[in-house]
Regions:
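Subunit-assembly interface segments of extracellular/virion macromolecular structures
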Residues: 1-181
């Protein structure tokens, strides 16, 4: 380890990127807040299973892909929330976010535990007022950094900077947690 540390210190400053893990900021991290239950079932039971799924609004026809989520207990507003990348405007060609009080439909099955929501059936309803908003997020892609004499692999990570607004005033960085195994 001593040789690696000396080599690293010769070529890299503390905290330097060795293999670039691109750092990005997304000021348009679209959020949609959901009712707590759908057909009597808490949606928190399958919220995490929605990441990566394509969804659409039952009435609006707006389409999006789910990229992240937060459960109601972690939400500043107390609602289960999906973060989305919108891909298609509505049936009227002007609506570009899901409507308030609209049922959402997944294009593929949602499996959780021993249960399943079949594709093309509603799985959740947006809240009745102010369901759509824009948050912001920062992402670090997979890479390697030189930290405290070690080459440290960092996995892709996303942090929601502001849950429901796009005017953050934060500093984002990596936190190093050292453990002896």
């Amino acid at each position: 380890q001593n040789q690696i540390e000396k080599f690293g210190q010769h070529f890299f400053k503390e905290g330097s990127m060795v293999i670039p893990g691109q750092i990005g900021y997304d000021p348009l991290y679209h959020a949609i807040e959901l009712e707590d239950t759908f057909l009597g079932i808490p949606i928190s039971e399958y919220l995490d299973k929605l990441v990566g799924k394509k969804i659409r609004g039952e009435i609006s026809g707006v389409e999006a892909t789910v990229v992240n989520h937060i459960v109601a207990t972690k939400s500043e507003r107390g609602h289960n929330t999906l973060y989305l990348k919108y891909s298609k405007s509505g049936n009227d060609f002007t609506t570009n976010v899901f409507n308030d009080g609209e049922n959402l439909i997944a294009s593929s099955d949602i499996e959780y535990g021993i249960s399943r929501v079949i594709a093309n059936n509603p799985f959740a309803t947006t809240i009745a007022l102010g369901a759509a908003s824009i948050g912001s997020a920062a992402t670090v892609q997979e890479g390697v950094y030189f930290v405290r004499g070690h080459f440290v692999k960092v996995n892709t990570q996303t942090v929601i900077v502001d849950q429901y607004t796009d005017t953050p005033s934060y500093r984002v960085g990596l936190f190093i947690d050292e453990n002896i195994v």
